[in-house]
Amino acid sequence: MDLKDSIRVIDGFPKEGISFKDVTTLIQDKEAYKYSVDKIGEYLKDKNVDLIVAPEARGFLFGAPVAYKIGAGFIPVRKKGKLPCETVEVTYELEYGEDILEMHKDAIKKGQRVAIVDDLLATGGTINSVAKLVEALGGEVVAACFVVELTDLNGKDKLGDYDTMSLVKYNV
């Protein structure tokens, strides 16, 4: 299945010069959505994953069903102030400024095997920050999986030696 057929590309969004890859059309297509979840699940099935960790918001769309498929728990990573209990946080750079991601402090136990799942890998800043949160709590990042990868932005380079996979690659 060619997932690009199910991903809407919007030039000039959110600003001029950007070509936005919209996965909402993919999740509307039940075959493409199931295929995406199944393929990521197949990639992770032999990695003994305890937990899937996914950043808000679109990471939840793929991370939670993958966790269910492989029999793992699911941990949401949220923007600052959205989680009710004690958290750990990491600040990361955006194109214009900074943002903060948080995870509950008790979300991961030392030694748990974690896969990070998100809709898109661009510069790698978000996923690198999520990996730092996982490792700060003693988890081991065993894979980072994406539906879409924007290869020209070299996000994989920022992820170092992490085992990564993506279902669709675009040159921006």
UniProtKB/Swiss-Prot annotation:
GO terms for biological process: adenine salvage; AMP salvage; purine ribonucleoside salvage. Belongs to the purine/pyrimidine phosphoribosyltransferase family. It is found in: Cytoplasm. GO terms for molecular function: adenine binding; adenine phosphoribosyltransferase activity; AMP binding. Catalyzes a salvage reaction resulting in the formation of AMP, that is energically less costly than de novo synthesis. This is Adenine phosphoribosyltransferase. InterPro entries: Ade_phspho_trans, PRibTrfase_dom, PRTase-like, UPRTase/APRTase. Keywords: Cytoplasm, Glycosyltransferase, Purine salvage, Transferase. Pathway: Purine metabolism; AMP biosynthesis via salvage pathway; AMP from adenine: step 1/1. The gene is apt. The keyword Electron transport does not apply. Homodimer. Pfam families: Pribosyltran (PF00156). Its main location: cytoplasm. Its EC number is 2.4.2.7. It is an enzyme of class 2 (transferase). It catalyses: AMP + diphosphate = 5-phospho-alpha-D-ribose 1-diphosphate + adenine. GO terms for cellular component: cytoplasm.
